[in-house]
Amino acid sequence: MSASTVRLRDGRRVRASSAADGRAWLRTGWSRVIFTVGASAAVGIAAGLGTKTAVAALLGVAVIVIVLVRPVIGAYTLVAVVPPVSGLRAGLPVPQLRPGEVLIASIGVLLLLLARPGRTPRWRAFDWFAIGYAVANAGLGAADLLSRSSPITLSEADKLLGPMQFFILYRAVLTTLTTERQRRIALRLLLVPSVPVSLLAILQEMHVPGIPALLANATDTQIFLTNSGVARATGPFAHWQDLGSYLFVVVILGVSLLVNQSWRVAKPRILAGIVVLAGIALITTVSFTPIAGATVGVLVLAMTARPRKRWVVRTAALIVLLSVAFAPVLATRYQEQFTGQPPAKQIPYLPENFNFRITVWTTEFIPVLQEHLATGYGPDDPPNLSFTYTESAYVTLLLRGGLPLLFLYAGLMLTLAFRARDLSDDPDAERRAVAQTLFILIVLAVFMQLTTNYFVNAGFPFMFWVLAGLLGDDRTARPRRLGAVLAATGAQRPAPGDRPPGRQSDLRRGRQ
């Protein structure tokens, strides 16, 4: 975090205490010795397991060294890499772990350990609900498994610890990226990787030779190749719903930056290009839920923008243009959903996938949930289910942790929504755009997750938790420290145009 300078009455400048001050235990002499010995041992053991393992270990040590020297680079890496690769299969390159999990478990944890003791962002209600949600998901699920004497397999462990990786990602971003400039760079890094994701989805939809097979191998799924209906792109994700949820956030964030004129993140044409490309890729998923959600979110942002008429006309024209361009694909999907014959068509006027979900909930999951509302059934699948996918975030939460987990989820979403609403008029354009994006995402997710599992799958949750971290700490935290310095020294605040010299003495003795 950049230092805040103040001017004393005698004209001298000093540096005020900041969140970057203090010693972290990983920067002590003993910690360096421990790290050197541990890194050497890790590389040596990896070398005995094979060349690929040794190279991976060496790269891991190099990344750790870079993060130790420049923690902000580690945070940028998490922001730029984790969301777009969250759908890749496990084993790239660490066995049994996905690339995003490896990055969060290494860089994310390391960033939290590097945080200055006593100077990390203060915990808000959202943080407490979030850690409570992560702990409850793991604790209640493990208790359910132990009560049935069921083993905790790797699959169950992944579900138990999944929310914890989201919390680590959130706190690592919040703790490390503390300045406006850092948050602007992070927003840029969050959007730019969506370009190759969108291009891969479009090329996959066009059946460009080699692309479908490449993505099938990278995600360990054949769903695009084996789908018998209309072609639905999955991109670098295992399912089109995951891709749709990721692009849904990209579109909302990009439009929010545009209407808030956040040109410091990217030029208007670049932002518009990213949004249009993501919109086209979103349509290739042929998933009505994220497409409808993005449409509503963009229109809401346009209605609140200034000048309103110009933005409404622009967004409406773009929506109409994309709808006309992809009308044949959307029409085919519409016919699939609304021309179902009995017994597939149970309730008139509802699409077939809604009818199917209602049937699954009423016949498969509700009988199980009625007996396990207090603590849930657990992360594993109940026996004797003919269809094991819950098809709803709320059903998933009730199944994994019962009403307590659902309550904690509602608490973290509500507290973040209130904070985002309060910051939707923030003077900083980027922070305002993030706040508006989060508020819209939370409101729309209430309805969208009735029939989707966005909050626990790949794509959406990683973008969501990164944006929560980029919302930043309370702005009153730094003025309090600066105010304390001013009160203690009788200093005056620097003029807006003043620039501090390159090196100044610290108020505290012995530090420069």
PLM region descriptions:
Residues 65-167, 445-446:
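N-terminal hydrophobic segments of proteins, predominantly signal-anchor/transmembrane helices
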Residues 298, 437-446, 453-498, 502, ...:
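Transmembrane alpha-helices of multi-pass inner-membrane enzymes
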Residues 295-299, 401-446:
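Hydrophobic transmembrane alpha-helices and their immediate junctions
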Residues 215, 330-404, 420-427:
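Long extracytoplasmic/lumenal interhelical loops at the membrane interface
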Residues 11-12, 199, 204-209, 283-285, ...:
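A membrane-periplasm/extracellular boundary helix in multi-pass inner-membrane enzymes
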Residues 75, 122-136, 151, 164, ...:
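Interfacial loop-to-transmembrane-helix boundary motif in multi-pass membrane proteins
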Residues 3, 29, 60, 138-141, ...:
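Alpha-helical transmembrane segments of multi-pass inner-membrane proteins
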Residues 71-73, 113-129, 257-273, 307-312, ...:
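Membrane-interface helix-loop-helix junctions at transmembrane boundaries of multi-pass membrane enzymes
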